[in-house]
């Protein structure tokens, strides 16, 4: 069969890597792809938001199955456009992708269906938000309602910071129309854990847990980013936590969406906070995380096409989802200055060292070919260096070793990815 993957990041490289392992797949295309994906798939110069061009390409090439990795096209309704043309596509429809596309929607859904989450209020007026904050308990969390590249969340320790945050989100429109509505949420403390799942509209199957590192600098300092590294599984995601989430969160979310007439098909990413009062939902994403996909997919035993097709066909209950009893750690190599300003176009050396190594993966995010055919940096997050091992400590050691194999002029990484592994009992 012929498969088209839509997107261009490390997550899409991880998806393409899994698809390439399927004996059912003869040909992979990726739009627009990147320099790493090009080793496994034919990259097509069509942007992820160019729905008409993507549909025309899928028809022209007789694509059997399309996988959408990114949030923007999903929230924008790419699945509806493909389905209307009779094309098979993996991902939620527009009316279900709102689970990620609007934080206000997802908070209201959780409240209505009693899914554990932080107390909150939604605001469409900056004045009302400011009045509410005058009497609110600090610290407090402000969230832009819409998509903001994972950066639309502000944690405010004082009233002054909160007022500045309202100005930034609602008045200065730092995140554009994503800030037309704003969620104000109680600040929760605990450990953050990500859990990825496959969903077919009614059945949900949990993949594995992972733990992200959002801040740009060591010691969780600096600005929020799309993610600087990751490990899977999380040692803090215990059987007790899983039992609670299975009972009160996972199926409850799928059932809530179905009850609202918005059946969800695709991947639901649960961002959880493990609080003293039990697990609570921080956020939902309507797709694989990045770099969560890079640590979870290499551990999956199943043929990814079998699982994704079962989701689309509504027969996920027939799939026995299995993961290796191992661990993975991903360290992101970024351009120095990310997530604010950074130079790009630097030549990357050492990529060939990953060839033929089973336990090591170099997932490309911000890379491209220059005019000479050399692979150069082309973004803030450049590569996701991932290693698997028998346990988290071994995987971490291997990932940091492999991070030294590659070099480019403004290479930057965190040196404490997975430090929480040492804190686990």
Residue ranges and their predicted role:
Residues 367-372, 376-425:
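Generic C-terminus detector
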Residues 156-293:
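Internal nucleotide-binding/catalytic subdomain
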